[in-house]
Amino acid sequence: MKSLLAFGVLSFALTFCGLQDKLKGLSGGPASNSNVTSNNSNGTAPPNTTGAPTAEKAKPSVTQQAVIDGGTETKWDDQGLSWKLPSGWKKMTATKESFNYSSPDNAFLLVNISTLGDSFPMDVSLKAYYDQAMQQLKNGKYESVKMVDIDGIVGVEFVEAPPASKDDPRRHQWIAYRKYLGQTQQLNVMTSTKGSNFGKHSDDFPAILYSMKAVK
């Protein structure tokens, strides 16, 4: 379990670190990107000005909605976020920047908050993530990619294709940006388990993601 979690956390960071470093270069000063940064201060979806597809509202299936309805609300008070988790999921760690839970069979909810500069170009960054994910879809690394609005926050949702080894991790992830308490934040929500266990959680994972509620 520890090795799987460690690998998941490492991959979680590597998924966006390189791209985010490039995007930070775009943030420069306020004047350099005033035409692309969002003025939205409550974390709701910014207007679509970057050419990214219009986000669809999160729509759980009947089975996924049943998972949500039967789940236990788990709050991250430091960040004003909450999710509905299936029975038996337990807290591993909760800090101001990360929020991690696990299931009895080693599935994980791993959430990370990154605080960015006030002038960080959220819209441009989100479009870049979407474009990168679409390229990964074409390359066969991802099984599906879409823009999804979860409780008023627009993000890129993607599901990894089955790994080469059934013991390697497979992830269902959603990356978004928001303004919260005066901060510009990247919100990275990942559900993960080993490849052989992924099918068992094929409804749990989207249900967890779509159950998110955010204080506005």
Label every model-predicted segment.
Residues 187:
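Glycine-rich phosphate/pyrophosphate-binding loop shared by adenosine-nucleotide-utilizing enzymes
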Residues 112-120, 145, 193-198:
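Second-shell loop/turn segments in exported
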Residues 131-181:
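Signature of long, low-cysteine stretches enriched in small and polar/charged residues
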Residues 1-7:
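Sec-dependent signal peptide recognition
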Residues 101-128:
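A short acidic-to-branched-hydrophobic micro-motif
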Residues 10-16:
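Hydrophobic h-region of N-terminal signal peptides that target proteins for export
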